[in-house]
Amino acid sequence: MFKLTSRLVTSRFAASSRLATARTIVLPRPHPSWISFQAKRFNSTGPNANDVSEIQTQLPSIDELTSSAPSLSASTSDLIANTTQTVGELSSHIGYLNSIGLAQTWYWPSDIIQHVLEAVHVYSGLPWWGTIAATTILIRCLMFPLYVKSSDTVARNSHIKPELDALNNKLMSTTDLQQGQLVAMQRKKLLSSHGIKNRWLAAPMLQIPIALGFFNALRHMANYPVDGFANQGVAWFTDLTQADPYLGLQVITAAVFISFTRLGGETGAQQFSSPMKRLFTILPIISIPATMNLSSAVVLYFAFNGAFSVLQTMILRNKWVRSKLKITEVAKPRTPIAGASPTENMGIFQSLKHNIQKARDQAERRQLMQDNEKKLQESFKEKRQNSKIKIVHKSNFINNKK
């Protein structure tokens, strides 16, 4: 019995030992990555002395960082400066305005002005405020000979002003066609005898399309805005796309326009009446609030154009310049001849009312002259019809006799 029990225990122990051996064999071996991971984990708690010394030598100290701070700020400022310099580089090439939809033609005034502005800006290297000023002065210099001829014509007219006013009043007051033609011939003879060609009086009118071209060109360029317009101003108006916050340009423009009007206009020879002088004093003052919302680029053109007008007026009023350019001296005002209607002592509104009534009377007289001309033509046709010779055939004469 005991032997049987011992055999059973021995057999069970042997079986369990074999099972344990089998389990030991079946268990998988750990992966090398796990071992390396565990090794790295345990190694992190105890760093190598060589690694620590290498890190310490590579990292800069606090003193080194503090000493390098000025150089870092200097490099940052240089980067900002270089970035600022790149602004405006796009507009320094011919064709830039055309690429953004501006300066499309060569016949429209604003497009022509934009082409000229771009050429001056690219080839001169001036900032945009200098480009506007230089272009304005360049165009006014090209127009100076026309103003010289206009000034000479105005001065020649001043010598015959009383006689010319009398003939003009006769021409406007007559209702007889033949009498009007006779007065017109007398007026033409008077002008030709003094070498006067009134077509030169229209020379300053060329400034109107040029001024409108500048206005539209600069307004579109500021609204886009053109590259460089936002930072290539000067003084207190560095941004040409915005309105002048202090209205300084508007005040300067009004002052220069009043000045050259007082000096005798752009030809330096015009003699404005008192009502016209008062009118040309009030209008520039009214223009200050009217132009307060315009961009600085537009008002800058007005300011430089007005300043050049003052300079031109002072030059054309100089006696030495007039003698060198062979410009006739302006005659002093004389007493009007009978038949002239001076309006020197009238106020602004009285003068305006007088001119309106004068234009109305002139229109009525013109209509009356046209009616008289039609009546003369009809009477002439009737007389011509009655004066025709009637041809009578012999057969008709015999028949009538029978």
From Swiss-Prot:
Q: What does this protein do?
A: Mitochondrial inner membrane insertase that mediates the insertion of both mitochondrion-encoded precursors and nuclear-encoded proteins from the matrix into the inner membrane. Links mitoribosomes with the inner membrane. Forms pores capable of accommodating translocating protein segments. Essential for the activity and assembly of cytochrome c oxidase. Plays a central role in the translocation and export of the N-terminal part of the COX2 protein into the mitochondrial intermembrane space.
As recorded in Swiss-Prot or TrEMBL, the protein's gene is named: OXA1
What residue ranges lie in the Mitochondrial intermembrane compartment?
A: 43-118, 221-239, 293-297
Region (Disordered) location: 366-386
Report a single Gene Ontology molecular function.
membrane insertase activity
Which parts of the chain span the membrane according to its record?
119-139, 200-220, 240-260, 276-292, 298-316
Gene Ontology cellular component? mitochondrial crista; mitochondrial inner boundary membrane; mitochondrial inner membrane; mitochondrion
Self-association and partners: Interacts with the large ribosome subunit of mitochondrial ribosome. Interacts directly with MRP20. Interacts with OXA1.
As for family, the record states: Belongs to the OXA1/ALB3/YidC family.
Its record classes its membrane topology as:
Multi-pass membrane protein
UniProt KW keywords: Membrane, Mitochondrion, Mitochondrion inner membrane, Transit peptide, Transmembrane, Transmembrane helix
The answer to keyword Chaperone applying to this record is no
* Highest taxon of source: Eukaryota
Q: Keyword check for tRNA-binding, yes or no.
A: no
Could you identify this protein by its name?
Answer: Mitochondrial inner membrane protein OXA1
* Presequence range in chain numbering: 1-42
**Record localization:** Mitochondrion inner membrane
